Amino acid sequence: LFGEREPDRRARLLHVLIDRHGKNAVHISHAPQAPEEDEEEDEEFYTEGSHDLLIARRRMAAFSLQRAKELLRQQRRESTASMQEVAALRQTALEPLKSYTNLGTQVAAERPVSVVRFSPDASLLATGSWSGKASLWSIPNATPCGTMHAHEDRITGLAWHPRATIGQPRSAIHMATGAGDGAICTWSLESERPLSVLRGHEARVCRIAFHPMGDYLASASFDGTWRLWDVARAQELMLQEGHSREVYAIDFQGDGALVASGGLDAIGRVWDTRTGRTAMVLDGHAREILGLAFAPNGYQLVSTSGDDTARVWDLRMLRSLYTIPAHHSSVADVRFFRAAESSLPSMDEDGSDTHSLSRSGLYFATAGYDGLVKIWSADDWQLVKSLRGDAGKVMSVDLSSDGQYVASGEWARTFKLWGHV
C-alpha cells in the first residue's frame, strides 16, 4: 500500500494469515535472522601431503640445517672484524658501482624482454621475452650462444640451476623457464629442445626459482597458487594456496629453509619449506608485489611493488624494517648481489677460517617502469647509483656474481649491459 513501511507490511500479513488459517495455526518468530553469507569464511586448513613430499621436506631440512650451521659460523667470524675492515670492504664493493655506465644494448627478441638472469659463473646471460623465446648470450661481448623456442606464450619466469656452469654436466638441467601457457620447461646446454615440461598450473606461470639444493623448483602462477616440483622426476610435489589473488613472485632463502611468495593481493608470505607452515606475513604494500629477494644473510628480505616502493623485512623481528621510495612507477624486479666465491668460509686443517669477509649481500638492484635501474646499499638502504636507459620500462634486472656487470631487460625488446668502460 502507498506509504506502507516494512513493519506495517508484516502486521498486515499477520492479520491475513490469522484470518485464513486461524490464530493457532500461525507461528511468527520475531527472532532476528542471521544474514546469509555471500562468501565462504576464510579459514586455515591443511591437506595431507604425499610420501614424496615428505621425503623432499626431510631432504630440504637436512640441507638447510647444515647450510645454516655454516652460515652462522661465517657470521660469528665476521662479527669479530674491526670497523676498519668492514668499512674497507664496503668501500671496495660500493665505490666502483658509482662509475658504472652502459656498455652496450642488444636487441634480444621481437617483443619485450621480461626477464634477464646471469649464470652462476657470470659467463652467460639468459633472456626471456614475450615472444616465448629464451636466448643465451656470452658475457661480456653479448654475442648470441643459443636460442630456445620455449613456449607458445610470453616467458615471465627464468632461473638458473644453482650448479649450472660451475660443475653441472652440460647434458643435465641448467635452466628453467615458465610462461603464459602454464608450462615450465627445463633445459640443458646441449640442446634447444627441453629436457622436460612441467604441467599442472591452470593459468599463466610467473616467476620461478630453484631451491638451493637444485633438486626442486618453485613456481608462482596466476591460478592463485605456487607449486613445488621435483625437476629430476618432472613431478609436482605440492600445490600451495594462501593468496586471495594471483601469485606473481617467488624466491628461496639461501639455505633453503624458507620460501617467499608475493601476490597481486599486495600480500607476501614466507613459508617454512620443512613444515609447510606460514612463518611470516608481509603486509604493508598498497599494491601488487612484483619482486622478492632474500638477502644472503638469511634474515632479511626485500619486496618490490606496484606502489613504487621497495620494503625491507626482518624475519627475526617479523616486521617491515624500512620502506624505500625506490622509483616513480612500478618496481618490477629486485636482485641481491651474491659473490662468485662461496659466502661461507673454508677451513684450514687446524679449524681456522681462511676466507676474507664476503661481499655477498652488500648491495642490491631494482628495476622500475620509470626506465631506471637503481643500485642500493644493503646496510643503510641508500641509493648508490642510478642507471638510466632510453628504452622505456625496465622489466627485469640482475647482478653478475663477479661483481662486474648489471643486466637489465627492457620493454623495447632489448637488454642492456652495465659496468666499467
What are the residue ranges of the model-derived segments?
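Intrinsically disordered, low-complexity regulatory regions of eukaryotic regulatory proteins
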Residues: 4-6, 34-36, 42, 50, ...
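Eukaryotic tandem repeat interaction scaffolds
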Residues: 250, 257-369
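Nucleotide-binding motor/catalytic cores of P-loop/tubulin-like NTPases across gene-expression machines
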Residues: 382-383
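Short, well-ordered alpha-helical segments in soluble proteins
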Residues: 212, 233, 244, 254, ...
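WD40 beta-propeller repeat fold
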Residues: 77-242, 249-251, 281-283, 322-326, ...
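Intrinsically disordered terminal extensions that flank WD40 beta-propeller domains
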Residues: 1-111
